[in-house]
Amino acid sequence: MTFKGTTIVAVKRDGAVALAGDGQVGLGNGIIVKRDAVKLRRLYKDRVVAGFAGSVADAFALFERFEGKLEESQGNLRRAAVQLAKDWRTDKYLRRLEALLVVADREAVLLISGGGEVIEPDDGIIAVGSGGAFALAAARALARHTALPAVDIAREALQIASQICVHTNDRITVEQV
């Protein structure tokens, strides 16, 4: 039985970074088992926020590993992300994990994947999960055409995604750094 997480969006704007995640957790067969899950974690002395989409158990294993990499690199987000991606790609156990991580501090927003990719979006906005494309489009439109702060853009983008994607709900958690 695999539990799946759904949608995360991150927005960097005017020196602030916000991550938002919906609360829905479902089984692979479309059954909703939890509506108010928290898919965001504060890490490294509350200076880093991380969110996940994909397998819940896999994401927790990756959060733990990433937190260790942050400690080793004394909070250097990029270095910790590259080290996790390298381990994820080369370690026989980690390679089987199915999740995507979005991590952020005040300086950067990064996507880390199991293929060894560490991606920093050009515009400081990224979204993953089943409603990721909807949340990304909404966040970019809001960033271009409003003066809303990062936290409001992230929340509203996820709200919009929840109205379009059946695997994303409107029980939204937001964390800001």
From Swiss-Prot:
Q: What does this protein do?
A: Protease subunit of a proteasome-like degradation complex believed to be a general protein degrading machinery.
Molecular function GO terms recorded: metal ion binding; threonine-type endopeptidase activity
What are the protein's UniProt keywords?
Allosteric enzyme, Cytoplasm, Hydrolase, Metal-binding, Protease, Sodium, Threonine protease
Q: Which InterPro entries match?
A: ATP-dep_Prtase_HsIV_su (IPR022281), Ntn_hydrolases_N (IPR029055), Proteasome_sua/b (IPR001353), Proteasome_suB-type (IPR023333)
Could you tell me which Pfam families the record lists for this protein? Proteasome (PF00227)
Q: Which GO terms fall under biological process for this protein?
A: proteolysis involved in protein catabolic process
Q: What is this protein called?
A: ATP-dependent protease subunit HslV
